[in-house]
């Protein structure tokens, strides 16, 4: 949007400030399927360490006696969310990235940089105050749907920004670099709508010129 205004205007300067100081302007979000096969990690415990065996026993117990949130925070899900988050954060046209990984890393920094176990995460999820959980965790996970949401903003003031190419790059590299199979990550948000509108406008102009 910023390119529609002259650099001397207040709105341009304001949007540039948001871009440079507050992490970007145009929102984009990625919905990632984090479902996994039941007991995938615990299918064969014969060669596992005692610690891993205890983890599998805890998971089995939580599935038997608890709610879905008790066993949702598995290493597979957390690693997948972190991988997508880190990939998006590495892109030069991307500003602020927010996801469950953001919260996890704040917690890990307080926990002597140690990752939490699934059991610890389940306990934290239950014991954290409701208002904090609703504002800082719930927007980024859908337990019943086995989905994680990664929210980000694009740096609109980047001189070489190519929105269509960026969207294509993200869709492609989520599969080739991050390892998310096609169909398990959905890209949406205002940037997608804006890009679609521009592409429709360009196509309409081409057709109009061709008709003339």
PLM feature spans:
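Extracytoplasmic
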Residues: 1-212
């Amino acid at each position: 949007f910023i390119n529609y205004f002259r650099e001397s205007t207040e709105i341009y300067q304001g949007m540039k400030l948001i871009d440079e100081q507050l992490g970007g302007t145009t929102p984009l979000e990625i919905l990632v399927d984090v479902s996994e096969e039941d007991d995938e990690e615990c299918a064969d415990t014969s060669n596992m360490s005692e610690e891993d065996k205890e983890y599998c026993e805890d998971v089995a117990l939580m599935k038997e006696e608890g709610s879905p949130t008790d066993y949702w925070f598995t290493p597979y899900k957390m690693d997948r969310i972190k991988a997508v988050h880190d990939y998006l954060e590495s892109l030069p046209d991307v500003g602020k990235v927010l996801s469950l990984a953001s919260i996890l890393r704040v917690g890990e920094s307080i926990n002597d940089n140690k990752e939490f176990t699934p059991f610890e995460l389940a306990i934290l999820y239950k014991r954290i105050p409701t208002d904090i959980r609703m504002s800082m965790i719930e927007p980024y996970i859908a337990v019943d749907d086995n989905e994680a949401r990664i929210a980000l903003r694009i740096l609109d003031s980047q001189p070489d920004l190519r929105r269509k190419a960026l969207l294509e790059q993200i869709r492609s590299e989520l599969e080739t670099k991050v390892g998310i199979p096609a169909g398990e990550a959905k890209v949406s948000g205002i940037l997608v709508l804006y890009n679609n509108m521009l592409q429709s406008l360009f196509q309409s102009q081409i057709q109009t010129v061709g008709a003339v």
